[in-house]
Regions:
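Membrane-proximal interfacial segments on either side of biological membranes
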Residues: 1-45, 50-282
């Protein structure tokens, strides 16, 4: 049992205004194994738990076989870098969302026979779009809120993503808009003006739903927005595509080359390796 009277998470470049709270770390029994719990003493219902369990509670002839489980269950916002630190053992690629990003919701991760599975639902707030797009060839600026209705990972691949993203103000490079129109089939509306190069335009609202599964990619406007994905000065800039597109077009969108080439970058190479296997190849 470890009690830390004053704990605050401050990432590199953070403002230093993190709430200071008492943190408890304890080792507890968990079925056929042990678990380490991380929780704030003033709110013990919100916790991060890392467990190592004997598979099926049995020992085999070749020795003990273990299952690793990582669980996050929190109704209050916890720093995303803090959660990523707990998930580091899973070996996944953790995309930088900024030092101020926070998460509330549920995450369940497990490893059986070397394969990781994960399921997640919840909300991420204060996502720094400049940091999030820093590894890409084109960039965004602003602060976003992302709602994960469902994220499912199995057998080293994404199985399903269903999420929504909203940013009330920011800047978007024109090349993003051009690619969304050319590659994903978004439609141009009255506030669209073609600007050259990487010139950025300000926006008052960016909002979309994204669904990824073996059937392809759907980019959707949010309810009540009349199909609009991006607004500038109160006018629609681009509208949602009329149909689902193939998953390789997501890699094209992020590749940053013209004509689009894949993998193009390390990011898109990784993405292609983990996207769902299309129904046509099953």
């Amino acid at each position: 049992l470890i009690d830390i009277q004053n704990f605050a998470w401050e990432g590199f470049g953070s403002s230093g205004n993190s709430r200071v709270r008492p943190l408890r770390i304890e080792c507890v029994s968990a079925g056929s194994g042990r678990a380490i719990r991380f929780f704030f003493r003033d709110s013990d219902k919100n916790e991060i738990r890392v467990a190592r369990l004997l598979k099926d509670g049995l020992r085999s002839d070749v020795g003990e076989e273990y299952v690793t489980e990582i669980q996050v269950n929190t109704s209050e916002a916890l720093p995303v870098p803090f959660i990523f630190a707990a998930l580091r053992k899973s070996g996944g690629m953790h995309w930088d969302l900024g030092d101020q990003a926070v998460f509330s919701g549920q995450i369940d991760v497990s490893n059986v026979e070397g394969y990781w599975t994960a399921e997640c639902s919840g909300t991420m707030k204060q996502v720094d779009l400049a940091v999030t797009t820093a590894l890409l060839s084109a960039h965004l600026q602003g602060v976003a809120e992302i709602t994960l209705n469902n994220f499912l990972w199995s057998q080293s691949r994404i199985k399903n993503v269903d999420c929504e993203c909203i940013a009330d103000r920011g800047e978007i490079e024109q090349v993003w808009i051009d690619r969304l129109v050319r590659i994903l089939g978004c439609r141009v509306d009255e506030a669209y003006h073609h600007l050259s190069g990487s010139h950025a335009r300000s926006f008052q609202r960016l909002g979309f739903g994204l669904v990824i599964d073996s059937g392809g990619l759907q980019l959707l406007a949010l309810p009540g927005r009349s199909g609009c994905l991006l607004e500038s000065q109160g006018l629609p800039v681009i509208l949602e595509p009329l149909q689902t597109v193939t998953l390789d077009r997501l890699a094209w969108l992020l590749s940053g080359t013209r004509p689009p080439a894949v993998p193009g970058t390390d990011v898109t190479a990784w993405l292609l390796s983990v996207l769902p296997i299309p129904n046509a190849f099953r």
